[in-house]
């Protein structure tokens, strides 16, 4: 019996060991924090997390300028909450009144403190203080990790160095011997500056503010360094990097080997960047205020970045120009990509400068337009304003001697030097009456030489012509004008993209967005609605709706033309010419009795054709695209490591411009819809093209699209992108600009939303991230971080390819690999349903010119031929690809929305009104759309919670407690309530985990299941032994 007792206790000991191992495996799992994935240096992790949990700096903007101590006393007397303090700023601006203060606020009570401050009568707003890091935008994300600081463009760079942006994407071919010769040519002589020098104009008595890295007081290249100020936290006025010195040399250097344009210009060096190229918003705001107080004439800022929603910075730039300071800024070094304009150069009141090489070609590094502020309902403005030489420009070294640098941050001081020279042309007594940001821009753009080849969104008005601008200023009288002043459909390629597609009746409005330059005053008004004056009878076929601001301030405004051909012009072929005039007036200047008035004119030369057949018309969905700013929208291709943001606009005329040209070459006509899908008439279009979309859909849109396809015969082509919760979790990082965690709002595309849209067609995408090369009928293509098709109806054609799935870790693959998962994933599907046809593909990188490896324009054309004209390519519609049974997946296995992020902040759908905006046909403006001509109502879809839209526009605020939870597979993290129910073992932030959440639970479940099996075995053994004892006892009794 003793031996039996020892043996029987063994299973119990085994059970205890199994349970112990189960708990240990979970508790000793890989750390949930991984510095590399959080994009922070290990030594900084603890400090940054600690700072994030304790104190955050906020900028408090006031409605009035007062001494800083008065603002501090006001806050201390009004704010009753604790946990905050005033931060003293010791700098040269201290002696002047200010309109802002900087506070530290403890994280634990920030909501109460910020709310109380925002309700104060004298407070304008409250914003998190930003930190700026001046680095190449493409280099802001080494190995896919964000560097500390706000994303900004690079300083200038030396050719051939690693810092040369886009070195492998240059679109310029240079003759090397000529290149070396040109390198020795003075940039001043290339613009003819010596002609003005001979007339005695050298920039005298012009106050030039250089916002950069400082300058040395005893530098021999400069005649008049009037003042040096330091706005950083470093105790030095000197330039230890060399960039500020170089910029000053281009503007005002006097060394014969690297002459500046205006050697007698008075230099005011504002050191706003540290030696590590770091700056803070408050430093800029103080320095800007000081520039205003000390009455600067010109200001050069050779920086820029994509965030045009940093309101304290943007609005302070407006205040700078409103104070009659002419600001010049670099347009950015993110070329040759389109849609990459940098702020503040993209503001209409700033002179934005692009770069050209010595052969008058647009430099490969120079950012291209259009501006993207206006999307999706409007259209971008023309930027840059002008271009200037920016490759191998000679300038001053840090202490003595000369060197050459390249970049738009070099082209910017070239123009700033020209501006200083032009300012000195006007007698000092008349300068403030004649010169201002608008009149100087008028002189530059009207005098510029248009280059042959580049379009208006690459070169603006063209190359700066110093002597022509000089002639304009000599006879200048205050007036208003429009830029560009002409839209000519015969002037291709300058008028691209307009000249690529004629107008026709029934199309969505063509929007042309112009800038009003008001040289008459800082404030102006439109006297009466703009007027269209056709040059001939045919001009009456054109219908124009105008949009313009109530007030033109500071110095600039906009005039947007929304143009349609009337229905009676459906068969017209020819040209329409005429002028649009707009009358502008400003208050009288000092000594004048009446307002200043001016009539601006915009010349139109438009081509019109008969309305194309339905099969040749494509509608592009712009409305459901979300970009940065304001949301953290991750890159589409995860292989691209130097750019983590999707910020190029995703527009036909930005990063999809090559695709647009291809479709036009193929005979298709493409129109843009910036409103919901209820706002177009499906009978007019062969195909709705939906590419790389991140937003959700109104229920009315889903219902209408189903009817449009099945009953109206609309074709539908969808190019999706990756969506994987675990990958999005890993892309989360702590941003020391905003002292907050950034997490992707969605994946490369919003797959859960697309699946809702496609559900009525029996189609759904999955959450795999697929990569690899494949070919169809000899056409090679690269699948770059695309998704898979997991649901597809019978009767359609579905194509699979052997692609690598990078969405699973090695551990997950080992555990979950089954026979079914070894099948090649489906990525391309074609389907006839009802009267319409649908084509879906899981990757859009092959259409996006920003980070394309190989294009798939050939595939897009085949899909459009099918969806619009029912032309079936024999390879795509091979019998081997036909599905005789549906591909089915359980609803619970489909990718689900993330409920731990405030998606409504960035969405045009969630919590918003369904309404057709001014980009849609005139007849449905302000309605819910076709057959729904009533005002829309706010809609909130299930699974989303509302938030305060007044703050947090530049980052994603994560919910501490997700509102609901479905499964680890669907959402990727546990609810906090569930965590607490397990004895506090799971109280860490699960969203930080680098190890896949489903994997961990499967491992744990496997171990626990093993333990349960052991217990069952023990129970069965005991049952058998019990029966044996009873049987033995019965036998003895017998």
UniProtKB/Swiss-Prot annotation:
One of its GO terms (molecular function) is serine-type endopeptidase activity. The chain crosses the membrane at residues 1001-1021. PROSITE patterns: SUBTILASE, SUBTILASE_HIS, SUBTILASE_SER. Residues 1-30 form the signal peptide. One of its GO terms (biological process) is proteolysis. Its main location: Golgi. It is a single-pass membrane protein. It is an enzyme of class 3 (hydrolase). Keywords: Glycoprotein, Golgi apparatus, Hydrolase, Membrane, Protease, Serine protease, Signal, Transmembrane, Transmembrane helix. SUPFAM superfamilies: Subtilisin-like (SSF52743). Interacts with PME1 and PME5. This is Subtilisin-like protease SBT6.1. It comes from Arabidopsis thaliana. The lineage of its organism: Eukaryota, Viridiplantae, Streptophyta, Embryophyta, Tracheophyta.
